[in-house]
Amino acid sequence: FASKNNLSLNFKNPFKNFTVNESYETISWYLTVLTRWFDYNDTFLAKEWAHPSDNFGAIFSYFYKNDKYKFIDFANALTKAYEIQGSLCLGTSLNKLGYDHVFYVKIASGSVFSHLVNKGDANATRRTVNNILLDGPSLRAYRHFPNVGKRKSWAAADASKRGIELSIISSYQDEIYESVQNEDKWGFETNFLDNSELGFGKDLNNWVIQNVLFKVLFPAEFHGQSAVEAAIELSDEFNQNINKLEKVNIYTHEPAVRIISNKDILKNASDRDHSLEYMVAAALLYGDLKYEMYEESFQGFEKINNLRKKIFVTEEPQFTKDYYNFSKRHISNSIEIVYNDNSISEKITIENPIGHPSRRAEAVPLMKEKFLRNVKSIFDTEKASEVWDKIINLKKDDNLNVFFNILIENE
């Protein structure tokens, strides 16, 4: 996509690639892809799943080209996008009908961008949302065997870019398509949702952005993060008794069974980081989980593949109830090891992985470590820590130029 948009990529500092002459769509696409590529995306789990940070590129693109604002204006716009996407996820499932969650990115990014670029014109925003409904959602087939592929890494960028395109088109006087959501024959709900209602699962405020999940320690689909933690706790015992192994039992919530329990052939790393059995096998064997463990070139690849065949996943109904309980929102997993002499290890249960709102205090220092580790080829530790601290200490009334200068001045 870089050559298509005539960008000269600067991986030391991607923000140096942009000028105010770049289109909103280009900036949004680029940053949304990079957020996923570098694994900085957050997560929100409900009836539908989401990475609300997928909206960052679209919101950033507007303020980067229109920087006479305060930091609080940027933060408020981002909060609105998070709230729209997350509340839709609480209200209506797309995945059960085979559609991908990035459709809600298109709605959230498109509607907030429209509000910004059209200076609060309600009709323009209505046109934007209804044009997005007319587009419809994409299939999520590229996230599942046998069609897993790299599209899952750029699907959100595509959605945010399209949301911006439709918001700009909708700036012009045109039909609003008032009844497209619920019209009986040709409407969105009739044709895409099997007559279910598209709606918010709660009142809109700022709750979603305060309750996202941060991927802190492990490169794994979030429904399996607590299982990886549990497996690491059992790793020493597992390796001491590996010759006695009969099987490994995982007890989990229904969404994990449906999404990431996969003992089939795993064709690539994208398949493997969405296999509960694979990630737990790696964590049991090596007491950790790193990106390279998903690659066929990893020296322990065959060991992991052989072990996952002995891992069995079962739904624990209470975990499913706690997953959907609005006051808990647990992402629980239990693991036990069964040996061939009929003995069983301690069952390790982790209700919420690091990165869950209930463990925020543990997560923030680890997030800083992740940042320092990921930029060590560019900045020394002192410089990286300085960049982190400057961003964390931004004040709401700071001019946005202060924010942008932090990003641009560091080479």
Give the role of each language-model region.
Residues 1-48, 147-161, 168-411:
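Terminal-appendage/accessory-domain detector
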Residues 53-60, 105-112, 160-165, 224-228, ...:
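Well-ordered alpha-helical segments within folded domains of soluble proteins
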Residues 63, 114, 232-236:
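Generic structural signal for well-ordered alpha-helical scaffold segments
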Residues 64-161, 165, 180-185:
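Glycine-rich, mobile lid/loop segments that gate access to catalytic sites or pores
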